[in-house]
């Protein structure tokens, strides 16, 4: 099998290439070969390549690893110049959509995209073994990057300011070593947005170290798929509720059983599981095409 993988730089997507090739799948990264079996798109970024490849080789089927699909982004200013209608066009054209949470599936269905083409594939997390001391240094950690157009943007910062609680936000600017230390030494984490496909995988990586997360109970928050009832939820409809939950969690910070946290995270899909799933789905599509 041979695929054209179209993706901008991504610490969770680019590592797939090596795993695909270890399993006998040739990957052309942001390029295409006439013998490709599939064009795999991943996001609205670099859609011009998908468009170019499809126009050059219109008979090569498209599949989509759909990482996110946010209404708040569609309706916001568009500084990157994304072509949303073209993105939706190719999602509709794709043979299958592999979605990393039910939030993604729900939003796409609301935009008229065929839900029957969607398959849930929870994305792998970058778990690590921490050699230092896991402790509570009394600060809240927000691992997810700023979503400035989300309706809940600023809720956490305002709550922490009013409660005089330290908040750390690396905004993807910390080194890997610094990031691991931030996770290992926080009191707990928070992912307050209304709309996010996973809640930020840091909430899962931190949970393996025994750190809990406060998250929105929005139906468009993907943490429910990744942490389930192991997260602490606040009422997404009321910005005062996050302040109340933050205060309660700060004053009585949960300390879950570390072994149980580790076992839970060890059952999360690995990068190999993700690649095996995608290969299996592509083989099914190929067989389906032969029958038709």
Residue ranges and their predicted role:
Residues 38-40, 54-76, 98:
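Active-site proximal beta-strand in glycosyltransferases
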Residues 70, 103, 120-131, 264:
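Short beta-strand->alpha-helix junction loop in the catalytic core
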Residues 77-97, 184:
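Membrane-proximal helix-turn-helix segments that form the acceptor-binding/catalytic region
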Residues 126, 131-151, 157-160:
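Conserved donor-binding/catalytic core segment of Leloir-type glycosyltransferases
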Residues 130, 237, 251-291:
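A charged, aromatic-enriched C-terminal amphipathic alpha-helix characteristic of glycosyltransferases
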Residues 181-198, 211:
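Acidic donor-binding loop of glycosyltransferase active sites
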Residues 212-216:
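Short hydrophobic beta-strand element within catalytic cores of glycosyltransferases
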Residues 228-239, 247-254:
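Conserved acidic donor-binding segment of nucleotide-sugar-dependent glycosyltransferases
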């Amino acid at each position: 099998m041979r695929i054209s993988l179209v993706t901008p730089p991504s610490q969770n997507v680019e590592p797939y290439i090596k795993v695909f090739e270890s399993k006998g799948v040739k990957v052309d990264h942001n390029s295409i070969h006439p013998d490709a079996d599939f064009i795999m798109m991943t996001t609205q970024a670099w859609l011009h390549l998908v468009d170019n490849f499809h126009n050059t080789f219109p008979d090569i089927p498209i599949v989509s690893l759909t990482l996110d699909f946010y209404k708040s982004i569609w309706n916001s200013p568009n500084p990157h110049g994304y072509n949303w209608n073209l993105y939706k066009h190719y999602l509709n054209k794709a043979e299958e959509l592999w979605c990393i949470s039910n939030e993604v599936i729900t939003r796409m269905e609301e935009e008229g995209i065929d839900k029957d083409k969607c398959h849930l594939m929870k994305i792998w997390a970058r778990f690590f073994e921490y050699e230092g001391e896991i402790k509570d240094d009394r600060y809240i950690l927000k691992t997810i990057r700023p979503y400035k157009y989300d309706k809940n943007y600023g809720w956490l910062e305002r709550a922490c300011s009013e409660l005089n609680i330290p908040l750390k936000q690396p905004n993807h600017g910390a080194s890997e070593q610094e990031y691991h230390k931030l996770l290992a030494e926080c009191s707990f984490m928070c992912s307050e947005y209304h709309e996010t496909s996973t809640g930020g995988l840091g909430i899962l990586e931190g949970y393996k170290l025994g750190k809990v997360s406060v998250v929105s109970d929005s139906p468009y928050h993907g943490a429910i798929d990744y942490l389930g009832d192991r997260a602490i939820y606040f009422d997404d409809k009321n910005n005062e509720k996050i302040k109340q939950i933050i205060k309660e969690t700060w004053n009585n910070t949960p300390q879950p059983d570390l072994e149980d946290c580790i076992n839970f995270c060890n059952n999360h899909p690995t990068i190999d599981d993700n690649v095996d799933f995608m290969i299996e789905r592509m083989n099914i599509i190929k067989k389906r095409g032969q029958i038709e």
